[in-house]
Amino acid sequence: MLQPIGDRVIVKVKDEEEKTVGGIVLASNAKKKPTEGEVVAVGEGAYASNGEKIPMSVKKGDVVLYDRYSGTNVEYEGEKYLVLHEKDILAIAK
């Protein structure tokens, strides 16, 4: 499994929508990039300028919402993931 470093988080990307609410099948270039996923790994956290560790706000298993254009897409062992900085996470779904 991938292990993020620093304040990075690895998110399992939720599948893209294949159809609209009305049932129309979307072409690949018309699909919206997902903005929701499940946290599968969390880094150790960032360090403040005084050297103190800043704890992470998210944990493995959290479902998070993130900005559509943030992070780096990676594929590992056939699965799609997104590597994000914690600051790019907008909310945790409860």
From Swiss-Prot:
Keywords: Chaperone, Cytoplasm. The keyword Nucleotide-binding does not apply. SMART domains: Cpn10. GO terms for cellular component: cytoplasm. InterPro entries: Chaperonin_GroES, Chaperonin_GroES_sf, Chaprnonin_Cpn10_CS, GroES-like_sf. It is found in: Cytoplasm. PROSITE patterns: CHAPERONINS_CPN10. Pfam families: Cpn10. It comes from the Bacteria. One of its GO terms (biological process) is chaperone cofactor-dependent protein refolding. GO terms for molecular function: ATP binding; metal ion binding; protein folding chaperone; protein-folding chaperone binding; unfolded protein binding. Heptamer of 7 subunits arranged in a ring. Interacts with the chaperonin GroEL. Belongs to the GroES chaperonin family. Together with the chaperonin GroEL, plays an essential role in assisting protein folding. The GroEL-GroES system forms a nano-cage that allows encapsulation of the non-native substrate proteins and provides a physical environment optimized to promote and accelerate protein folding. GroES binds to the apical surface of the GroEL ring, thereby capping the opening of the GroEL channel. This is Co-chaperonin GroES. It comes from Lactobacillus helveticus (strain DPC 4571).
